[in-house]
């Protein structure tokens, strides 16, 4: 699995409201979260499809 997918979900420090997806290593699924718009980490994908492709979800 891509190491970025193992990072914890991080909403970032800003207060915007961007719908994004992250890989949840507990459920082994990509799940939606609201990204604040700055900082955060690499476990942050624009689409469910991108998250599933990068993180190998079947």
From Swiss-Prot:
It comes from the Eukaryota. GO terms for cellular component: extracellular space; nematocyst. SUPFAM superfamilies: BPTI-like (SSF57362). One of its GO terms (molecular function) is potassium channel regulator activity. Disulfide bonds join 5-55, 14-38, 30-51. It is found in: Secreted; Nematocyst. Dual-function toxin that inhibits both the serine protease trypsin (Kd<30 nM) and voltage-gated potassium channels Kv1.2/KCNA2 (IC(50)=2800 nM). Gene3D superfamilies: Pancreatic trypsin inhibitor Kunitz domain. The keyword Disulfide bond applies. This is KappaPI-actitoxin-Avd3b. The record marks 15-16 as: Reactive bond for trypsin. Pfam families: Kunitz_BPTI (PF00014). Belongs to the venom Kunitz-type family. Sea anemone type 2 potassium channel toxin subfamily. It comes from Anemonia sulcata (Mediterranean snakelocks sea anemone). SMART domains: KU. Residues 5-55 form the BPTI/Kunitz inhibitor domain. The keyword GTP-binding does not apply. InterPro entries: Kunitz_BPTI, Kunitz_BPTI_sf, Prtase_inh_Kunz-CS, TFPI/VKTCI-like. Keywords: Disulfide bond, Ion channel impairing toxin, Nematocyst, Potassium channel impairing toxin, Protease inhibitor, Secreted, Serine protease inhibitor, Toxin, Voltage-gated potassium channel impairing toxin.
């Amino acid at each position: 699995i891509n190491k970025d997918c193992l990072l914890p979900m991080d909403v970032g420090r800003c207060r915007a409201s961007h719908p994004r997806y992250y890989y949840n290593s507990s459920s082994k699924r990509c799940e939606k979260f609201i990204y604040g718009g700055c900082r955060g980490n690499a476990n942050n994908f624009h689409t469910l499809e991108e998250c599933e492709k990068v993180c190998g979800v079947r």
